[in-house]
């Protein structure tokens, strides 16, 4: 398994539900193509005990892939920037503050 993690903020005026809909549509398409197994979208929940050097961003996503090879293939698919994925990706990305986005891939140790 490999997991892409993302941290970001929504642009002012963007409703959480609007982003969730766009993210779900994007991930459903990737699942239909055989790249993604599951995903999640969460909001940071500040906590006086758990918070040690927390991110400044409010939102988090994760996208799980069966393995590193499929994660790499998915990256190439998204980077190709072709329809129908282009519209789904741009619809989702237009809702986030680009300067706050951080994405990274993790694998089991």
Question: What name fits each language-model region?
Answer:
Residues 1-2, 102:
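Short coil-to-beta-strand
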Residues 2-9:
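Active-site-flanking beta-strand signature of metal-NTP-handling nucleotidyl enzymes
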Residues 19-24:
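Short amphipathic alpha-helical segment that frequently serves as the phosphate-/nucleotide-binding helix
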Residues 25, 29-37, 51-58, 62-103, ...:
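An amphipathic, aromatic/His-enriched active-site/gating alpha helix that lines ligand/cofactor pockets
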């Amino acid at each position: 398994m490999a997991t892409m993690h993302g941290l970001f903020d929504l642009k002012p005026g963007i409703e959480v539900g609007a982003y969730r809909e766009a993210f779900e549509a994007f991930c459903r398409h990737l699942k239909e193509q055989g790249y993604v197994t599951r995903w999640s979208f969460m909001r940071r929940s500040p906590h006086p005990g758990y918070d040690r050097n927390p991110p400044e961003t409010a939102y988090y996503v994760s996208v799980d892939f069966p393995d590193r090879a499929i994660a790499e293939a998915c990256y190439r698919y998204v980077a190709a920037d072709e329809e129908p994925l282009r519209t789904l990706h741009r619809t989702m990305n237009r809702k986030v503050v680009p300067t706050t986005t951080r994405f990274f891939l993790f694998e089991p140790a």
